[in-house]
């Protein structure tokens, strides 16, 4: 079975492609077992026959039936697979308007249930392979208050890729522990190619980067710095506007969400298929209820 990624899918095309649960099970099975990659989770056998459940596969040795949902982020969802696909599609295309309140009303599902699924999606995005930044990278930091804890703040570091012709490339952000001198350096190591030139401000806390990175320079291009500041302002407005009551432990999930869309902003047609494909091949994580 050849893996199929949907390209250029529109809301109308989505409804035509996914009209019932069976359509979703079929697509998920194609992604999960791409190129006939079935391996029984119980005994490791690689031969199968048709299972009892829709598009399930039954191991010919131990007779274990495995659903397309098993071992994926979709495992144990509290609504239909079609609804899950619809939520993910909304998540990819609606952006700012995809609040849990709006989606709860649209699909007649409890807001908490919607939030828990969205949190699973955010966690899944956080497990995606990082495409390392390899152009000039401008480093910025900002602080937002934690509305749930008095006098508490959240420290966020941003790395924005700016090409030689002044175009904005990809970017990443993480919530960090400001008390750790190594936090920013470790963030860059996770997201930037070792040969990348890092541009930083002349702040004391950036001293560790000067000695720990191959090519570090101070801000010089005012236009690039302005682009960085505009990027941070947009991110901050999104966090403080849409998710101003988000607790510290969940901010990274929203950063994952923001940068998944940002980094695919020129490839919006593949957002849905990219995300579903990843979720089909990612083990589920336990999520905490929103406090």
Positions of predicted regions on the chain:
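Residue-level recognition of single "structural anchor" positions
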Residues: 1-291
């Amino acid at each position: 079975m050849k893996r199929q990624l949907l390209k250029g899918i529109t809301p109308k095309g989505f409804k035509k492609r996914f009209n019932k649960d069976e359509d979703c099970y079929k697509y998920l099975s194609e992604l999960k077992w791409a190129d006939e990659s079935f391996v029984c989770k119980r005994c490791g056998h690689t031969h199968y026959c048709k299972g009892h459940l829709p598009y399930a596969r039954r191991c010919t040795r131990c007779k274990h039936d495995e659903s397309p949902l098993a071992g994926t982020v979709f495992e144990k969802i509290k609504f239909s697979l079609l609804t899950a696909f619809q939520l993910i599609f909304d998540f990819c295309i609606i952006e700012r308007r995809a609040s849990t309140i709006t989606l709860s009303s649209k699909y007649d599902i409890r807001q908490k249930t919607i939030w828990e699924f969205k949190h699973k999606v955010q966690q899944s995005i956080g497990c995606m392979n990082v495409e390392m930044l390899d152009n000039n990278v401008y480093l910025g930091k900002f602080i937002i208050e934690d509305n749930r804890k008095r006098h508490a703040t959240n420290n966020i570091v941003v790395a924005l890729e700016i090409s030689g012709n002044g175009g904005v490339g990809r970017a990443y952000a993480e919530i960090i522990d400001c008390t750790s001198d190594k936090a920013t350096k470790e963030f860059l190591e996770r997201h930037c190619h070792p040969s990348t030139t890092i541009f930083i401000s002349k702040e004391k806390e950036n001293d560790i980067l000067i000695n720990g990175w191959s090519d570090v320079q101070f801000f010089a291009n005012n236009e690039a710095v302005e682009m960085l500041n505009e990027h941070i302002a947009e991110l901050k407005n999104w966090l403080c506007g849409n998710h101003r009551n988000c607790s510290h432990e969940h901010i990274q999930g929203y950063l994952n969400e923001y940068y998944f869309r940002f980094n695919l902003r020129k490839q919006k047609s593949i957002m849905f298929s990219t995300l579903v494909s990843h979720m089909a091949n990612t083990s589920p994580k336990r999520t905490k209820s929103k406090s």
